[in-house]
């Protein structure tokens, strides 16, 4: 038996249609907050790629931490890309779970070998990758080198 690919949950990424309305609901109904807001523009400057192809995407995000786990609400601002497609197909909801991994390079290499690398970029000095683990785990895994900060995609 091999060792775990991840050893801790860091973030829950939720794709939403209306960021402000969702934040109000999370605050009013569930007591989750306070929130930090950011606009994230991804593209050539941070070597953003979806399925290996260069792309440009814009999102608004809101981030709150609950019990040591970051909740990231993502509102796609363009009609393309993995978040916009998820919103169109599913109507929103949990898109990914970010996990701590003991070996970022191996996790990414394995995903590349299995055609499961959905997204790769650099943001705020951290390398980020989305691994397509939906078939096996029912959700996309996000892995990173270093520690993601507020406004991490």
Residue ranges and their predicted role:
Residues 1-4, 9-17, 61-70, 72, 86-103, 105, ...:
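Vicinal oxygen chelate
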Residues 22, 26, 97, 107, ...:
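Hydrophobic pocket/interface hotspot
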Residues 33-85, 127-148:
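Conserved short beta-strand elements that form part of the metal-binding/catalytic scaffold
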Residues 7, 55-57, 122-124:
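Short solvent-exposed loop/turn micro-motifs enriched in small/polar/acidic residues
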Residues 1-48:
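Long, hydrophobic N-terminal alpha-helical segment
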């Amino acid at each position: 038996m091999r060792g775990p690919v991840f050893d801790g949950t860091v973030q829950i990424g939720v794709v939403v249609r209306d960021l402000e309305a969702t934040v109000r609901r999370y605050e009013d109904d569930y007591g989750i907050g306070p929130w930090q807001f950011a606009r994230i523009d991804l593209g050539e400057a941070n070597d953003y790629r979806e399925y290996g192809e260069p792309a440009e995407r814009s999102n608004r995000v809101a981030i709150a931490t609950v019990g040591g786990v970051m909740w990231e609400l993502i509102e796609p601002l363009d009609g393309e890309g993995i978040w916009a497609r998820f919103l169109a197909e599913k109507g929103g909801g949990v898109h990914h779970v970010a996990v701590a991994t003991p070996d970022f390079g191996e996790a990414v290499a394995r995903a590349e070998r299995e055609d499961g690398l959905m997204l790769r970029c650099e943001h705020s000095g951290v390398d980020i990758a989305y691994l397509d683990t939906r078939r096996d785990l029912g959700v996309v895994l996000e892995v990173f080198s270093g520690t993601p900060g507020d406004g991490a995609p």
